[in-house]
Amino acid sequence: MHVKKGDTVQVMSGKDKGKQGVILKAMPSKNRVVVEGVNVMKKHAKPSQANPQGGILEIEAPIHVSNVMPLDPKTGKPTRVGFKVVDGKKVRVAKSGESLDK
């Protein structure tokens, strides 16, 4: 996958097109990611030990990884991801040449 947990991304298509957020969870086996504040669904929860009140919760549902693009650290715009080998490690690189991995 071209994105990882903690990356700042922009949604490129769907009902939340244009929104930006941080990836909270990545699911490579399903090709899906959960982005903060994107694809928010309402879930009905029964009262439990963790949530004694119960009620309606708003949670982020996963979206397909093809619908998001990471933001370039240099320009702040969505960018495609390339890969380079630096010191024997495969590193993700934005098209501007800036490294996406910390």
UniProtKB/Swiss-Prot annotation:
Record bears the keyword rRNA-binding: yes
Gene Ontology biological process terms from the UniProt entry: translation
Gene Ontology terms: cellular component: ribonucleoprotein complex; ribosome
Entry keyword annotation includes rRNA-binding: yes
InterPro entries attached to this UniProt entry: KOW, Rib_uL2_dom2, Ribosomal_uL24, Ribosomal_uL24_CS, Ribosomal_uL24_KOW, Translation_prot_SH3-like_sf
Region listing for Disordered, in residue ranges: 1-22
SMART domains with a match to the protein in the record: KOW
CDD domains membership: KOW_RPL26 (cd06089)
GO molecular function: rRNA binding; structural constituent of ribosome
Keywords: Ribonucleoprotein, Ribosomal protein, RNA-binding, rRNA-binding
UniProt record similarity statement: Belongs to the universal ribosomal protein uL24 family.
Assembly and oligomerization: Part of the 50S ribosomal subunit.
Role description: One of two assembly initiator proteins, it binds directly to the 5'-end of the 23S rRNA, where it nucleates assembly of the 50S subunit. One of the proteins that surrounds the polypeptide exit tunnel on the outside of the subunit.
Protein name listed in UniProt: Large ribosomal subunit protein uL24
